[in-house]
Amino acid sequence: MNVVEINLYNYGSAGKIMLDIGAHLRAAGHSVLVCYPATGGNLKRKVPDSYRICTRVERNIGMILSKWTGCEDLFFRLPTWRLIRKMEHFGVDAVHIHCLLGWYVNFPMLFRYLRRKGIPVVWTLHDCWPLTGHCTHFDGIGCGKWKSDCRGCPVYRGFPESRVDNAARLLRLKRKYIAGMPALTLVSPSEWLADLAGQSYLKGTDIRVIHNGIDAEVFRPTESDFRSRRGLEGKRILLGVAMAWGRPKGLDVFVRLAGELDDRFAIILVGTSDEVDEGLPERIISIHQTMDRKELAAIYTAADLFVNPTRQENFPTVNIEALACGTPVLTYRTGGSPEVVDPTCGSVVAKDDYDALKAEILRITEERPFSGASCRERALQLTREKMCADYERLLRELVQ
């Protein structure tokens, strides 16, 4: 098969998944073309067999115009035309789309071409943007307008930022160009989002569930001197990990915990920044983004409990990474986050039930009901290898 993979980034969670799938397909004898725009972060990484959909200048100009008009569909025609020509020259058999938002492609033009050619398309729902007229997550604000028309969008100034509320128009365009595509298959990493997709304008589309997976060879129980280096011997370590910290990821919950838990506890947050540090109490140990995954595995291993009080989530790989390192998980019942946890490896409490979360922290760190072995056993059901094999199986099915 000749497979084209398209994503906004070649790094981060979705970018890593895209590259993992690409590497797996190549190892299985398939040809893969990985496509993404020329952003600062993307240009830092050399990716084999890749194609830059647009230049930085094209993206910056289109981004400014899109923000001020709210008409993401009107721009990036030339980059999309070049992408289509590249796919035709490549001899594409199937297209795997990840994140299309982010100012780099003209989605009506792309889907019009894919529909006309009857090319099998797999679209992985890394967030809720494919279902809405604008936002990437509606769970945190309790908005249900995506089920009808997205008129009067309450978050149109949020990512992808716009100065004009054009959400209703963009949702109509998605209905026009995407709904009813016979060769389209949606893949959700969680049962939660698959259910929501079935309630959207995409109901009737073939919807599958393929859980995200992690590298269990990297994320495994890892002995280190982390506790002694940080002066945390004998402490009950609560750990949180996120790409971007804020209220959606429960930063305020950790701040509150720091003010209420006694000195037996230590709180560590990974993935912070100088800006986040300004609002943190001294009790919270802040570790900025680490690119060393083995170092991260050592931090997961050193923790007594991984706490994920997220308010908007799809299927968080951080939960799986913690389990793979033998650390139990405590999470809010948000999105697909609870699907990672079963009774052998952690606990789930109602979303925003702070008192229940705190009570579970005290219980789990005192009773220690979850063994490291049972945590890792659960994580081994959600590996990168299984995820990639499931995607290869699906692509073969659609092409054949």
Question: Positions of the model-derived regions?
Answer:
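Nucleotide-activated donor-binding/catalytic signature segment of Leloir-type glycosyltransferases, i.e.
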Residues: 271-297
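Aromatic "clamp/platform" in nucleotide-sugar-dependent glycosyltransferases that forms part
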Residues: 311
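Conserved acidic donor-binding segment of nucleotide-sugar-dependent glycosyltransferases
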Residues: 343, 347-354, 363-368
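A charged, aromatic-enriched C-terminal amphipathic alpha-helix characteristic of glycosyltransferases
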Residues: 369-397
